[in-house]
Design a protein with these regions (language model features):
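Proline-centered turn/helix-capping motifs that create local helix->coil transitions or kinks
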Residues: 36, 100-104, 141-143
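Short helix-to-loop capping/linker segments positioned immediately adjacent to catalytic or ligand/cofactor-binding
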Residues: 98-102, 120-123
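A short glycine-rich, His/Asp/Glu-containing loop-to-beta-strand
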Residues: 100-115
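Conserved short histidine dyad/triad with adjacent acidic residue
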Residues: 112-127
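Catalytic core of Fe(II)/2-oxoglutarate
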Residues: 129, 139-212
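Eukaryotic charged/polar low-complexity linker/IDR segments
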Residues: 133-134
Length: 212
């Protein structure tokens, strides 16, 4: 796990080689399962796809919110291994010197799996949480182009690499540029996967020692 802290133009963290081989095996078992028909659903207004105030869809991909999919967290490989983001007293966050990460307190998080193929994108938006962590995964060799993350207010682009995690304040505007894939690689699970974790402080939930 290679952690790099950034301070400009806003505080963020990039972690390369985020998951180890054993964790990746567990994650890919679930991703392959989720790619069966009817598991990951096309983003629509009814399925929870983000939209503009006038009803235009921002999200053009396939997705599923895992917390609502499983009755128990330990039924999901992904929901179990992604706890490492909050482990050891928020060690990943606290090692960053920014006030944002030093003072971060959350007691609730949700996980979404997204999948992008030809022409899929996510137009510029903000997330309704405090902190967002995006982990990108794809099968190698890479069979698509595009799909990088843009932060238009800061003229910044974050490149998508396999097993890379990008952690940043949720109120920063961000989007995904369109993905391009040759026809022979479509519908083969060879696109861009993104595991999104959204953390926030829910004042109705008592803070536990693990969230200090």
């Amino acid at each position: 796990m290679e952690i790099k802290n950034f301070y400009e133009p806003f505080p963020y963290i990039i972690i390369d080689t985020y998951y180890n081989d054993a964790e990746l095996t567990l994650i890919w078992e679930e991703l392959n399962f989720l790619c069966y028909p009817s598991k990951l659903r096309r983003a629509t207004a009814k399925s929870g796809g983000a939209q503009t105030p006038d009803g235009q869809l921002l999200k053009l991909n396939y997705h599923s919110y895992l917390d609502g999919l499983y009755a128990f967290r330990d039924m999901s490989n992904i929901l179990m291994v992604n706890r490492k983001l909050f482990g050891n007293g928020y060690e990943i966050f606290r090692q960053h010197d920014s006030w944002f990460f030093k003072n971060l307190h959350i007691n609730k998080d949700n996980t979404q799996v997204g999948y992008y193929e030809e022409n899929d994108e996510y137009k510029t938006h903000i997330d309704s949480s405090t902190i967002t962590a995006l982990t990108w995964l794809y099968k190698t060799p890479k069979r698509f182009t595009g799909g990088d993350l843009i932060l238009p207010d800061y003229d910044t682009e974050i490149k998508v690499y396999n097993n890379r995690t990008f952690i940043f304040p949720s109120f920063i505007k961000h989007g995904v540029i369109p993905v391009s894939m040759k026809e022979q690689y479509r519908n083969t699970k060879s696109g861009r996967f993104c595991i999104s974790q959204f953390g926030q402080l829910d004042m109705s939930i008592p803070m536990s020692p693990t969230h200090d």
